[in-house]
């Protein structure tokens, strides 16, 4: 229902317009207060790159963060990552991730980024506190913040927006009548707009999510996902249909698709109940970090990597690298 409202297919969005105007007024006032200097943002002693969204819901932001971290690491840059840690609850903040940190403590996306990149990752509702925790423990040269475009309390040097190329901005209205956290005109002020799927417009960077080999959660064995039989597909991400479509494009045709809420807590019994005799469970990598501790032999995940096209990605990386002292 929310998807139909936000796309404009359902007329119910009109009933939510008063709340949207209020949301837009408050969010605009917050941004203006920082722009005018009425509120002061904290500036880190190293450059800060924000990777965020203009809309609610999954746009492919985490793969972009991983891509950016890995590309900078390849250039010899020491990178740290901060996040709010949505979906997790730590005993105390800021929380600096270790190999023992669970998704229940830090959230699924920070744990995924930490496991994939090996970069220092810290989470805290106040992102400045997370930055300070990383700087106190690691000699990093640059900070990437996973989400936080609207978190103006942390000053930033580069802003990158990730856009769902199929859904774009829906009906264009602020939450809750539409998907917008900020209006589309905000794109004029960011340093780069990366478009996940669909067709990128002039000045935007095209991106595709390229699937790799399926990985067994228990053994680490790898195989072509199309070789797996009797698949039950599970996706607890912002836009589950994207994952199911990826499986189909890989030649894997699930018998059943189970969409879950983004960041949903997964209990062992609930996940086990999804898979019947002779079936194979295939999930996203973000779900896998939550399920690895209680995984069965027939559970697999399909990793995806961001692939950015054209000359703009290299120019963006050169610009970011030039900020490192």
Curated annotation (Swiss-Prot):
Pfam families the UniProt entry points to: LpxK
UniProt entry keywords in alphabetical sequence: ATP-binding, Kinase, Lipid A biosynthesis, Lipid biosynthesis, Lipid metabolism, Nucleotide-binding, Transferase
Gene Ontology biological-process annotations: lipid A biosynthetic process; lipopolysaccharide core region biosynthetic process
Top EC group: transferase
Family matches, as SUPFAM superfamilies: P-loop containing nucleoside triphosphate hydrolases (SSF52540)
Role description: Transfers the gamma-phosphate of ATP to the 4'-position of a tetraacyldisaccharide 1-phosphate intermediate (termed DS-1-P) to form tetraacyldisaccharide 1,4'-bis-phosphate (lipid IVA).
Family to which this protein belongs: Belongs to the LpxK family.
PANTHER family xref list: TETRAACYLDISACCHARIDE 4'-KINASE, TETRAACYLDISACCHARIDE 4'-KINASE, MITOCHONDRIAL-RELATED
HAMAP family linked: LpxK
Protein name (record): Tetraacyldisaccharide 4'-kinase
Lineage: Bacteria, Pseudomonadati, Pseudomonadota, Gammaproteobacteria, Enterobacterales
């Amino acid at each position: 229902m929310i998807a139909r409202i936000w796309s404009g297919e359902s007329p119910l969005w009109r009933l939510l317009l008063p709340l949207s105007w209020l949301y837009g007024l408050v969010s605009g006032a917050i941004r203006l207060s920082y722009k005018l200097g009425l509120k002061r943002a904290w500036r880190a002693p190293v450059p800060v790159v924000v990777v965020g969204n203009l809309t609610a819901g999954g746009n492919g932001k985490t793969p972009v963060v991983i891509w950016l971290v890995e590309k900078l690491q390849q250039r010899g840059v020491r990178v740290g990552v901060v996040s709010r840690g949505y979906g997790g609850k730590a005993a105390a903040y800021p929380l600096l991730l270790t190999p023992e940190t669970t998704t229940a403590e830090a959230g699924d996306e920070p744990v995924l980024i930490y496991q994939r990149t090996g970069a220092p990752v810290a989470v805290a509702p106040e992102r400045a506190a997370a930055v300070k925790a990383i700087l106190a423990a690691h000699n990093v040269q640059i900070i990437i913040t996973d989400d936080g475009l609207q978190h103006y309390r942390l000053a930033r040097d580069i802003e990158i927006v990730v856009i769902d190329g199929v859904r774009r901005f829906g009906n264009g209205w602020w939450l809750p009548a539409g998907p917008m956290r900020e209006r589309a005109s905000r794109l004029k002020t960011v340093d780069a707009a990366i478009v996940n799927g669909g067709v990128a417009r002039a000045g935007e960077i095209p991106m595709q999510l390229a699937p790799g080999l399926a990985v067994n959660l228990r053994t680490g064995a790898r195989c072509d996902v199309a070789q797996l039989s009797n698949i039950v597909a599970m996706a607890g991400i912002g836009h589950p249909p994207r994952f199911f479509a990826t499986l189909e494009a890989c030649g894997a045709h699930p018998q059943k698709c189970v969409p879950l809420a983004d960041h949903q807590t997964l209990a062992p019994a609930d996940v086990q109940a999804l898979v019947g005799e002779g079936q194979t469970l295939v999930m996203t990598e973000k779900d896998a970090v939550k399920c690895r501790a209680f995984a069965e032999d027939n559970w697999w995940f399909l990793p995806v990597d961001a692939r950015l096209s054209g000359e703009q990605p290299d120019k963006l990386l050169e610009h970011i690298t030039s900020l490192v002292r």
